[in-house]
């Protein structure tokens, strides 16, 4: 009946009875979504929620210790919102939940509220089929009472009670409240369902009450362990209406209670959410929910457990060109921690771009395979640039998840790798992860805290804010540490040079949406800083990528007239000269379109002993 149940939690330590109920309602391979909403003051940016999000994610992770049913998948979520009911409703829509289970503490401090502000507001217009649940333990519930009147929620209550009774091996008493009502309902679906339910083995008693049923329900409830009751609907613009029967049962009876209500149409609810949220709010919300810290994933055993559960393989590619000063320490640090001591990675591979120093020798001496990118897929030619090396690395790397980090890092730490990997293992919806960090700049022998990332701040971020504002929350779009799922990386083109990071970010966003992208704070990165003339050339190439993508979206039509060469100013003694340099990234097609790649992937997918 249900496939995905969302449970918002105020106190995750008390999640067990609600997890038990959700498990009893789900089929095998169903999914429970446990949600914690981080509240941000109404007039503050949602991005402020990023400060508390890691703490709440750690708190939610502890729920796994309360959950032991291997048939059901448990996923924990932390989301930010200006209001609790808003955050819950948005998550229902975004996650495609088909049942919302609202835990209720059993009382409210507001006399004019039945369940409390948040639940009452959600029940006014439920975003999907909804339960309000009061219980400390469902394991001992063996006798259910279902009072029904044939109203619009009767069939839902009957279906729910039937499924729950079947899972818990409980008996059901159906109490038909045949009270006269000024409102006319078509009871034929209810009566048809009632006839079918007579033959259900868990139905033990069928009672009919005439007149006012309130006291009959209260009296009968004393002989049962659980009461499941449907809300009553009526048109009332100022609020929702559960009806006096439900209100009295909720207030006077301390038995475990489930109140059910069905929604307005999903289309109407979704349209209301879309109208109420601005672009800036969507970006702020993404920033808070999809920005992680590497120390959230420092428990490597837990990452390994997630890897095994998902049955994925993981590759680390190290693009290199004359990096003999740093590549040895990078390989030793990562290999010892993430391959030798604990097999989180399945392979580490160096993708060299024809280095003339000892880069290749150092890597091979440390037992790491080295491929020269000019020799990969030679029938497709070769271009200069890091993007070319990354594109070709897709052909030689074997993993389902592919990570890349630069090889000029001087303060390498395993967290540069497991930080990128964590969100991909933790959140199935995340498909691409970017790193960000503090970037000190070295001037002479002095190391300054500021500086670094100059092309990012002067070129990439201004262009993103102007033309792709949905990506304006990406802190360092040009960072060289990133990774993703093969299934998405093989479906997008790669620019061959400086534009590779920009192109990937825009193309993955256009294809999969902002929610598929995450970023991770990798703390501090010390590396070799480039000269201003080199950064100028980098900016020139990156701007061309922006223009390529803008033209494809019909925002501008200038590319055919754009000059692809750049005049570089060179000092010569007391004078200057101009040097012309052609700076243009080539664009490699999606790797999935390359026949040799497809053949190689298909051969790996064949079972052992299969004919080729």
Question: Model-derived features: where do they sit?
Answer:
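Gly/Ser-rich helix-loop-strand patches that form or flank binding pockets
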Residues: 4, 19-24, 90-140, 221-273
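Terminal low-complexity segments of carbohydrate-biosynthetic enzymes
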Residues: 279, 526, 530-612
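Short aromatic/hydrophobic "clamp" motif used to bind/position activated sugar donors
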Residues: 402
């Amino acid at each position: 009946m249900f496939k995905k149940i969302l449970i918002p939690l105020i106190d995750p330590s008390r999640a067990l009875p609600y997890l038990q109920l959700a498990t009893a309602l789900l089929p095998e391979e169903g999914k429970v979504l446990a949600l914690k909403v981080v509240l941000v003051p109404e007039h503050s940016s949602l991005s402020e929620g990023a400060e508390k999000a890691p703490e709440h994610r750690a708190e939610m992770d502890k729920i796994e210790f309360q959950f032991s049913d291997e048939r059901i998948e448990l996923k924990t979520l932390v989301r930010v919102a200006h209001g609790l009911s808003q955050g819950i409703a948005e998550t229902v829509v975004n996650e495609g939940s088909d049942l919302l289970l609202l835990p209720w503490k059993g009382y409210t401090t507001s006399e004019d509220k039945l369940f409390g502000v948040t639940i009452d507001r959600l029940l006014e217009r439920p975003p999907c089929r909804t339960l309000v649940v009061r219980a400390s333990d469902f394991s001992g519930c063996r006798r259910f009472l279902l009072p029904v009147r044939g109203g619009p929620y009767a069939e839902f209550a009957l279906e729910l009670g039937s499924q729950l009774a079947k899972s818990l091996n409980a008996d059901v008493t159906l109490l038909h409240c045949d009270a006269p009502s000024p409102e006319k309902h078509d009871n034929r679906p209810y009566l048809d369902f009632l006839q079918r339910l007579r033959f259900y083995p868990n139905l033990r008693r069928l009672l009919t009450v005439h007149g006012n049923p309130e006291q009959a329900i209260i009296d009968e409830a004393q002989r049962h362990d659980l009461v499941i009751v449907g809300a009553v609907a009526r048109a009332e613009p100022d609020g929702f209406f559960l009806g006096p029967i439900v209100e009295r049962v909720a207030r006077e009876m301390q038995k475990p209670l489930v109140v059910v209500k069905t929604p307005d149409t999903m289309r109407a609810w979704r349209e209301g959410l879309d109208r109420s949220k601005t672009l800036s709010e969507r970006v702020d919300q993404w920033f808070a929910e999809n920005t992680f810290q590497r120390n959230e994933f420092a428990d490597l055993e837990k990452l390994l457990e997630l890897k095994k559960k998902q049955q994925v393989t993981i590759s680390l590619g190290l693009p290199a060109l004359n990096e003999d000063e740093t590549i040895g320490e990078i390989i030793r640090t990562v290999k010892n921690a993430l391959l030798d001591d604990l097999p989180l990675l399945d392979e580490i591979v160096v993708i060299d771009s024809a280095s003339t120093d000892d880069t290749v020798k150092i890597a091979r001496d440390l037992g790491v395979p080295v491929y020269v990118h000019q020799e990969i897929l030679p029938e497709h030619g070769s271009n200069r640039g890091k993007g070319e090396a990354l594109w070709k690395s897709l052909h030689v790397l074997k993993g389902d998840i592919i990570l890349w980090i630069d090889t000029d890092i001087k303060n390498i730490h395993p967290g540069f790798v497991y930080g990128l990997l964590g969100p991909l293992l933790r959140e199935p919806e995340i498909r691409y992860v970017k790193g960000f960090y503090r970037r000190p700049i070295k001037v002479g022998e002095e190391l300054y805290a500021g500086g670094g990332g100059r092309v990012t701040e002067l070129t990439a971020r201004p262009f993103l804010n102007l033309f792709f504002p949905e990506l304006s929350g990406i802190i360092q779009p040009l960072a060289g540490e990133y990774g993703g799922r093969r299934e998405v990386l093989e479906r997008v083109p790669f620019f061959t040079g400086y534009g590779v990071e920009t192109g990937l970010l825009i193309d993955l966003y256009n294809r999969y949406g902002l929610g598929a992208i995450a970023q991770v704070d990798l703390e501090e990165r010390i590396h070799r800083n480039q000269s201003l003339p080199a950064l100028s050339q980098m900016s020139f190439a990156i701007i061309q990528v922006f223009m390529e993508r803008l033209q494809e979206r019909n925002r501008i039509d200038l590319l055919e007239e754009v000059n692809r060469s750049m005049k570089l100013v060179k000092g010569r003694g007391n004078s200057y000269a101009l040097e012309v340099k052609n700076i243009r990234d080539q664009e490699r097609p999606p790797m999935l379109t390359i026949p040799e790649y497809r053949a190689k992937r298909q051969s790996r997918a064949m079972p052992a002993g299969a004919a080729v």
